[in-house]
Amino acid sequence: MTRIDDTFRRLRAEGKKAFVAYIMAGDPDLETSLAVMRGLPEAGVDIIELGMPFTDPMADGPTIQTAGQRALEGGQTLTRTLEMVRAFRAENAETPIVMMGYYNPIYARGVETFLAEATEAGIDGLIVVDLPPEEDAELCLPAQAAGLNFIRLATPTTDSRRLPKVLQNTSGFVYYVSITGITGAAAAQAVDVAPEVARIKAATDLPVIVGFGITTPEAAQDLAGIADGCVVGSAIVKLVGEGRPVAEVLDRVAALAAGAHAA
């Protein structure tokens, strides 16, 4: 049982949906992003997705791409991201943390070294957007052997022939990308997403979380209501990019979380 598994079990017992929040590590600097991260649980966040900045973020929209650039320009590295997690864990041992990003920084560090450091720091799961199931031996299987969940993305183009392969070694939860394209690109509609979520849930016992295109508490409520929860990223990262005070960012997160929890 991981912290992610425990969180979903608790939420089910409470009759609540999960609210997952994404932030970019080191955006705009280490101090600010750590302050936001530390405030997320009190704002109602059930699971934290922590973005690893990367120089070529092909799946990210302009908001998150720019956040990654700000973080890299501010000196953020994988080492400093792991330091962020350790600092957070010194105060919070309960809230799950999923690192999300691309394979290159992990490969450059060495898979075995990275997994040892990630588990020691207190990471619970990984989302690596550019590693397909055919490459599971590279990272997915070693990560699971190290006790980490490996969370896979399913999309509107993941057909019934492809879905079993996607789900085969997935653990923790399934992240359903509700729209085709890059992050933050459009608004997701529950009426369009519901049949796809039902199709995935028919194929797995894992929780299904909906992400991409959620910007308001109302949308969070609608989309969490047809799944096991929802993820908000670009809408939060945008506030950080605008230089809003940490307290204002967290107030907005709390409103989004309340929407999801009202589902």
UniProtKB/Swiss-Prot annotation:
GO terms for cellular component: cytosol. InterPro entries: Aldolase_TIM, RibuloseP-bd_barrel, Trp_synthase_alpha_AS, Trp_synthase_suA. Transmembrane segments: none annotated. Its EC number is 4.2.1.20. It is an enzyme of class 4 (lyase). Pathway: Amino-acid biosynthesis; L-tryptophan biosynthesis; L-tryptophan from chorismate: step 5/5. The alpha subunit is responsible for the aldol cleavage of indoleglycerol phosphate to indole and glyceraldehyde 3-phosphate. One of its GO terms (molecular function) is tryptophan synthase activity. The gene is trpA. CDD domains: Tryptophan_synthase_alpha (cd04724). This is Tryptophan synthase alpha chain. The active site is at residues 49, 60. Belongs to the TrpA family. It comes from the Bacteria. Keywords: Amino-acid biosynthesis, Aromatic amino acid biosynthesis, Lyase, Tryptophan biosynthesis. Tetramer of two alpha and two beta chains. It catalyses: (1S,2R)-1-C-(indol-3-yl)glycerol 3-phosphate + L-serine = D-glyceraldehyde 3-phosphate + L-tryptophan + H2O. The keyword Amino-acid biosynthesis applies.
